[in-house]
Amino acid sequence: MNVLRSGLVTMLLLAAFSVQAACTWPAWEQFKKDYISQEGRVIDPSDARKITTSEGQSYGMFFALAANDRAAFDNILDWTQNNLAQGSLKERLPAWLWGKKENSKWEVLDSNSASDGDVWMAWSLLEAGRLWKEQRYTDIGSALLKRIAREEVVTVPGLGSMLLPGKVGFAEDNSWRFNPSYLPPTLAQYFTRFGAPWTTLRETNQRLLLETAPKGFSPDWVRYEKDKGWQLKAEKTLISSYDAIRVYMWVGMMPDSDPQKARMLNRFKPMATFTEKNGYPPEKVDVATGKAQGKGPVGFSAAMLPFLQNRDAQAVQRQRVADNFPGSDAYYNYVLTLFGQGWDQHRFRFSTKGELLPDWGQECANSH
C-alpha cells in the first residue's frame, strides 16, 4: 500500500512539474537571469555605463505579460516609476536613459523621452489591466497614453497627427524627424479606441511606413519638410538597419484579418526576397537605391520569422536563430529574438483590435 501511495505521489509530482515546464518560457527565464536585476532594471551590458532604457523596460513589461509573469511585471514597473519617472508614470513620461555617470553615480543620463518605449509601456499596462483584471495598471496606462498624446504627438502640415520619437529635439519650424519603427501598426490600431489623436494617427503612421520605403526597405530615420514632403534623397544616405529591422517584424505580427497587412507585406517584399535568396537578412540597406551590405546578426533573423511568408525561408531563419542564440551580452539581439521567436512559437498573437492573445492556456492559468 505504501509503495502504491509513494508511486502515486511521484506521478503527481511529475505531472505538476510537466505542467509547470509547459507553462514556462525558457528564453524569457534566461533573459531575466542575464539582463534583469532583482529590482526590475533591464540592463544593456554592452555599454560600459551598464545602461537601462525606457525601451528595455517596456519590452520587459511586454514579455512578462506574454509569459503571465506578474511578479516580473510588477518589479519592472516599480523600478521604472521610481527611477525613470520620479515616482509616477501618471505624472511624467519616463526618461529614456539611465546608467552610471563618470562620477560613479547611478542616475538618469538623459531626461528626454523615447516614444517607442512609451507606447509599448502604455499598451502593456492597459492590456495587463484587462488580462489580469487589475484597475491600477489600467489607470497608469490611461494616464501615460494621455501624456504621450499631449507631449509627443504633433500636427504636421500635409500629414496630420504624428508621433515624434521624443518630446524634445525632433521638431523644427518647418521640419520633423521620425522613426518608422517606433509605433507598431498593431498598437496604433489598439489606441484608436481612445479617440483623438489616435484615430487619425493610425492612418498617418501607415503613410510613414509606406511612403518612406521607395525600394521596399524602411529607413531607420527620416525627415519630413513642410511643402516638400519626405526627404528620401537627403545629403546623408538614409540607411535601413538596426532600428528599421523592427518595422518588418511589426508588420509580420499584424493579424491576417487586418486589411492593411497585405499592403504592408507587398511594400516590404524586397526585404523578404533578399533574405530568401541569401539565407540571411542584410545588416544595412541604402533606402534610396536598395543596395544591401553585410550580414544581419541573429536578432535580425528572429525578426524575420513573423515577416517571411515562405515557409522554407522561415525554416532557414529559424535554424539560424537556434544555432546562434544570443548570449548574455547581446541585449538588442535577445529582445528581437524574444519577440520574433516568441511569436513563431505561438506564445502570443494580436487580435484585429490590437489586443494581446497570450498562450497562457488553461493548465497554465490553474498552475499559478
From Swiss-Prot:
Protein location? Secreted
Listed pathway(s): Glycan metabolism; bacterial cellulose biosynthesis
**EC class name:** hydrolase
Give the residues annotated as coiled coil. Answer: none
Enzyme Commission designation: 3.2.1.4
Described purpose of this protein according to its UniProt entry: Hydrolyzes carboxymethylcellulose.
Q: What's the protein here called?
A: Endoglucanase
